[in-house]
């Protein structure tokens, strides 16, 4: 079995997953990732700017009336939409009927607008959605709903697309979501977008990373004109949990799609609204959003001397990560206000976070356990797509695979109890996963690997992407049914050669290009800037590369 796994990567050059050269270079203390003071970061030039005019008002409630008739063999449940609405359905189930509450439910408000009902089903079974008819007397722009299934990786979807034949300014409505506590409400906002030249522009798209195949639901603006709208009702069979179903209104005057935008004429850059409800944001130089082949960048808020970075510096540098087209920032621990400062910066710039629980060799799991509480007390789960418990713990001989597995399970339970519903993993090089997959796979939701091609002496910088791609293919055979995410990858810009793997600025450029092309959509690039402070910690830096992985200027 193991030989078959090794053979896949070896097809490229005989040693894709070869020997101990594959082991990563991190040791105790090297979890920090700080800014090298001498690393100059070029400023981005933005060709487009966006002014967002926000109209605040009460969200539209879209309930459906409970059918008056009762069938003995059926039970009636109210299924709450996880995204936009509440839908009452009749569920047919073999389970015993649910006891009817003695309280009289409050009257259901009258439906006012024919927006689609979106329901996520947490249990399999047969569900009946009753028919409803609505009469509309005024033309209104409402939030519709669209579903799409995304494979694993980084994707940009939604938004409003327009074509302009000359430089112009356009104003258009777009649909977005606003979280309030545990509820997510879809709203219509208006954006004034400056197009500097002729071309195709997508306004207000959404960029996200999904570790596994996922059905996403996102709002779309629809214009409802006067008329009669009918939801014909239907019976559906849910065959897997978390299935999402959109029940549209049809017949009569069907809602139109996204309103057409002006193509050449200029529009006013402002709209008269109360000053308290107006916000402004800037667009990146790429109107369509982040590139799909740059998933994440590692970052920790440390200065060159190892001191903690100021909050404004974190905000600026995380903004540069966003400007380079990334969708995620990976952090390694909770010290130096990482959660607060990086979290606030990611929220401001629209990035997701991959959190980390750092395990030091000197304090072990007992010293790291307090980070569980740090994370759960912070609890901004809407910003988090993955939590990595331990970075190269087995590789650094801090603990065995079995001990690490127990600690990962402990962390996952703590996060779940605090309301986190996302994924949890740990990060190790490929050789650890190949040797300990049976122990680690059961406790992770996705296989997290640190894949650094420089530490295989048989591969050049130009072959970096092919090597890592083969390694990912091998790792997909380790944890059956689970995807793989590459949590660290890159190439040093200075240091000593490791066989065919030669560090340097030009070599880093070549390697990064290869990695982006081959595995960029499932990879976190290491690291934001050079880590000059590591000279205090690197006790076994064989190739003198530990301080020289900064690569943000390569994007």
Swiss-Prot record:
EC main group: hydrolase
Example GO BP: cell wall organization
Localization per Swiss-Prot or TrEMBL: Secreted, Cell wall
Disordered: annotated span: 92-114, 263-290
EC number: 3.2.1.21
Biased composition (Low complexity): 263-288
Pathway membership, UniProt: Glycan metabolism; cellulose degradation
UniProt main location, coarse: secreted
Described function: Beta-glucosidases are one of a number of cellulolytic enzymes involved in the degradation of cellulosic biomass. Catalyzes the last step releasing glucose from the inhibitory cellobiose.
Protein name: Probable beta-glucosidase btgE
Gene name of the encoded protein: btgE
